[in-house]
């Protein structure tokens, strides 16, 4: 084994030790129809038998306000918080989504959720699935149980006081603004992060327009955000890679992470090899010793 080969293997070991702890990738997941396979709001309403009431009220108010109203309806009809939790715990999810999340976290990626669902639904589901500790941040509408045991859902952005100013997004949440805040926080900390965004709905289109050229947008194929991006793909600066189900999500996500790690590894090895070559000092050859004949003794 040559010295240069040993140096390279040493550098690779150092690299992988660092990458196992942390890398420069942040993965932002939508929740409904991305992490889980259905819309959590519709799932709860349908499973508890309030679909007709929901459909009657739908044209009369914003979705977020409607869900708060539906939680009141459930409470008024004697539905308990435990019944809501039981419904949420049996929500369908593709079997490869959880392994994808665990693998991404193990590889050092930072994971976040940006969703128009609510904290109660999301936290109940991810705690049941055993993945709550993998997410560093959840951006969603606040949901809490009041003293009467009724689930109350509030808007992420209180549109009754002011507008968030984005015409593309629902009044209670602009996911694009959330992405800009995340980007700004990394810039302030001096972190050069690459973002991978996964989503399915129309509300995921605005954040796709905020991504940079080094980022990745993963829209679910044949879902609203994919349709919107397909209308004018040039508007999205990020690399777009669509997916169809949890298996495809895992494969594409792991592929991107591996690609990014390979690029970072090559950069690091190239940089370190350069330092090694510059740091080597060649000592000048010493002149050969001159043999002096010993004097004869008298």
Question: Can you describe what each PLM-predicted range is?
Answer:
Residues 4, 9-11, 17, 34-36, ...:
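A generic signature of intrinsically disordered, low-complexity regions enriched in glycine/proline
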Residues 4, 8, 60-63, 77, ...:
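Intrinsic-disorder-associated interaction segments
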Residues 15-17, 60, 72-74, 164, ...:
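Mixed-charge, polar/low-complexity N-terminal
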Residues 20-147:
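Alpha-helical substrate-recognition element adjacent to the catalytic core
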Residues 1-31, 42, 50-51, 55, ...:
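Non-catalytic pre-domain segments flanking phosphatase-related domains
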Residues 96-102, 106-110, 117-298:
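C-terminal cap/substrate-recognition subdomain and adjoining C-terminal extension
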